[in-house]
Each structure stands twice: as structure tokens, then as C-alpha cells.
Amino acid sequence: MSQIPDLECRAISKNFDDFKAVKEVSFSVPQGTFFSILGPSGCGKTTLLRMIAGFQKPTSGDLLIKGNSVLEVPPNKRPVSMVFQHLALFPMMNIGANVGFGLRQRGVNKTDIKQQVERVLERVGLGGVADRPVASLSGGQKQRVAIARCMVLEPDVLLLDEPLGALDLKLREHMKIELKQLQSEFNTTFVYITHDQSEALVMSDQIAVMNHGVFEQLGTAKELYYEPSTAFVAGFVGEANRFAATVESVNGTDVQMITDQGKALRGVDAGQGVQRGDTVDVFVRPEAVRLSRDAAQTGQLGNGGAGKVENILFNGANSQLILRDQASGAQMNIAMPQTGEFRDLTQGDVVAYGWEPQQTRVYSSARGQHGL
């Protein structure tokens, strides 16, 4: 892998009058990496992508591709290609003409265009379809044609702006796997923009979680999921039960708290140096919570109690149980075990639950930013 990153942003900022859309963002993407920028609507991720593509000029900072600044390079001269959410295929052209459009604009001769188009269509699994109309393709095939149209130009970086957003759920799940396989096949750096955490977690080598114009955390999918560095990342990446609490005592990283609803909890300081008396936000994943018909089994875990079943959200392997803690009234979302042991639970049943302190992450509070 090359020591010079394919893409590097150095303190990139973008202001729209008094509004700061992107605030001094710095990162680098090594060659051949699937890099995702994940965040909610309005966080600045599309603005950042448009600056990389050259459609918008940064207010400050520098942007380098293969070690060379491209701030003064127009979009059509940058070694990047872009796949949009709605693909922008030309309906009046056949598939081959769509894929070869960029090569024609570059003045490549017809023989070479035909060879390169056939080669790239083979690589995306669409060999022999060059003469077919675009309208004859399925949604997934159109997606591959859009990627082929970009990859035939051999860009250093491929930018993808929520390209799966217009697809139905089943096809979207399939295309997540296909996109990752295509990226590996071409060994090209992908920079992928999405608000869908599942897309980012499944496909990416590295993920940057963006919020209010800054990167909250940059890391692997596992790091973001199991070791979120901020309360925003803990709440945005994956599902979590969230509580507001006050710290009772701290011993190293071990934190004992009382929630606003009066429930005692033990957890782990997420590296923010919380102290006695601090207000904190507490997170625990639904799959970290264990169920039992015997309170003695969960009573030794460190956190938990007895809860009344309020609802059962059946979703196959992703089914969840909604409990109301009998002591505090707090709501708990708990992933249903796949053993089938608790599938007979019904609304109104009481069941014991618990989880270990190591599964509880504690962050300095930003009260007013959550609904609990």
C-alpha cells in the first residue's frame, strides 16, 4: 500500500455566510480503502464530498489527491469520479454508450472505447449487455452501470453520494455486499457518504462519524460500535438504551450512578474523566442485556432488575422486547435471544433482566440533547 494517501483533507472548512457547514476537518484515506462518512442530515457530509469533487470551493484548508493539492483544479480535471443517488444515466443512450461517455469526452478512439467498455462491464458482472437500453435493467444493474461508467475512467478516488438511497430494502441489502466486492475487485479508493449506519458498518474499512460539521470519531466499524468515544456516536451508531444519571462515586474507570428515575447503575467511564456529582449520559446495547426467569441468575451481573413486558417487536432474528422496569419505571429495549427460550413471553409478563457494568458506557452529559 502506497505511503502517500489517495486523499487527504487538511483543516478543510466551508462557510455559507455566518453558517459553518464544515469546520476544520482533517483526515487521510490510504490507497484501496473503503472510507465512509456517516452522519445525520445537515451534518456537512455532502458539502465535504462536493468540495472533494470540486463542485464547491473550501473557505479554508487544503485538499490533496495522491499528494498533490487540487484546490485550483476544476471538477472535470480532478482524478475523481462520482456516483449520485439517482445515478444520472442517459436514457437515450444504450448501456455501452453510457459507460463510454467519459472516454468519448476525453477524445479516446472508438476501438479503444469499445474494448475498455467491454472490459469494465465484464468486471461489474454485466458482460454482453452493451447494446441493451438502460430501461431494460433492474435497479441493481443500473447501479453497476453507474459504477462502470466511473471506473472506466480509472479515477484515483470514487465518490459515492448515498447511492443506495433510492433502492428498495431487499435490493439495498444485496447491493451493500456487491459494492464492497466491486471495491475490492477494482482496488480503488471509495469515499462513501451515507446516513445509514448499516451501510457504513457493513462495507467500510474506516468510518468517520460526522456531526455539526466536525468528525466526532474516526475508526473501524468495530471501534465505533463497541468503543464509541462520544455520547453522539454511542447513540447514533447502533441501537442503545440511554439514561440520564448523576455520578455517586468513581473508582478508576468504574462509575456508580443513580439515574434520574432513581435506578442504581454501574458502568465504565468512556474516557471523559467523570467525577462524583457529574451529570452523565449512560448507554447500554439491547443485545448486552440478558433475560432470565430466575432473578438470582441476573442479580449477580451488576445491573438489572425485574421488568414488565410492554411490547414484543417481532422482526425475526432482530426481534426486541420492550420492558418497563418495575422499580424505576424506566423503559428497556432488549434483544430477544435466538434460543427461542423466551418466545412464549406475552404482554404483561414479568421477567428478570440484567447486564454487566463493562457493557455500560458513561459520558459527560450534554443535557438537552436527548429525550430522557
Placement of each model-derived feature along the sequence:
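The feature captures the beta-strand-to-loop junction immediately N-terminal to the Walker
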Residues: 38-40
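ABC ATPase nucleotide-binding domain helices that frame the ATP-binding cleft
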Residues: 46-49, 145
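Helix-to-loop junction immediately C-terminal to a conserved catalytic motif
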Residues: 53
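Conserved ABC transporter NBD signature motif
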Residues: 61-69
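ABC ATPase nucleotide-binding domains
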Residues: 75-81, 85, 89-235
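Non-catalytic connector elements of ABC transporters
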Residues: 240, 250-372
